[in-house]
Amino acid sequence: MDSQPTSKVLKTGFLKKRSKYLHLWKTRFCILTNKHLFAFTGIEKDADCTMTLLLENCIETKKAENELRKEFTFSVNTNNLIYYFQAENEKEQNDWVTLIDNQLNHQIIEKF
């Protein structure tokens, strides 16, 4: 985890992330900051960063249970990609969606 975020950390925890091409679900340690969403292979100091998502490039986050037919899932949408995640329970799902959505709204306000 050498690329530690320098921004304010808002939430950390394990989420399952759906892979882009094979649509496999892999457990990732995620870190949400006020500017990024990071996904790592684990919590070890040398864990690989598998995703760095700049929140200013995101347009929305929403629950995705109906779309994916999987409990506690949500999506983070950019102009050209959709990232899917699965939380352990409804509370975690709501926490992640709310915190990411708050940051997206904050990014919009900062632009004006």
Describe the residue ranges of each PLM region.
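Eukaryotic intrinsically disordered, low-complexity regulatory regions enriched in serine/proline/threonine
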Residues: 1-12, 44-45, 62, 67-73, ...
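Polybasic phosphoinositide-binding surfaces of eukaryotic membrane-targeting domains
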Residues: 7-51, 96
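Short, surface-exposed loop motifs enriched in S/T, G, D/E and P with embedded aromatic residues
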Residues: 15, 58-60
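Canonical pleckstrin homology
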Residues: 21-27, 60-112
